[in-house]
Amino acid sequence: MANRQTEEKITALYERLSRDDDLTGDSNSILNQKRYLESYAAQRGYTNIVHYTDDGWSGGNFDRPAWKRLVADIEAGKVAHLLCKDLSRIGRNYLQTGFYTEVMFRQNGVHFVAVANNIDSEEQNSGEFAPFLNIMN
């Protein structure tokens, strides 16, 4: 019998900063997003961290390189958890963002957390305001 090495699923940390976001100052910087998400993941014991970073990309454009790589990894069953700072990091088009958060992530068994919005797909009531927040993005 051949030995099969099981691959541990990853905890994906997604960071995005558009040129317009950069004007808001340091709080949304890529480095700050990474630190924020790494701290959250460590506090919860999430391991096998992989960063997906789109620096300089608009949230209205879902044809972002790191985003496309992340979606491919989700579809390939490689992702257990997906963390982002807030829903606006996923995207600014509420219909597309809603498709990912409400349909695609669930269908692929991905635990999704938008930390600053207190949205956690494993918490029963945490996503009640997600559609409203999504529209506001």
Summary of predicted features, one role per range:
Residues 1-137:
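Short, structured surface patches at the beginning of a domain
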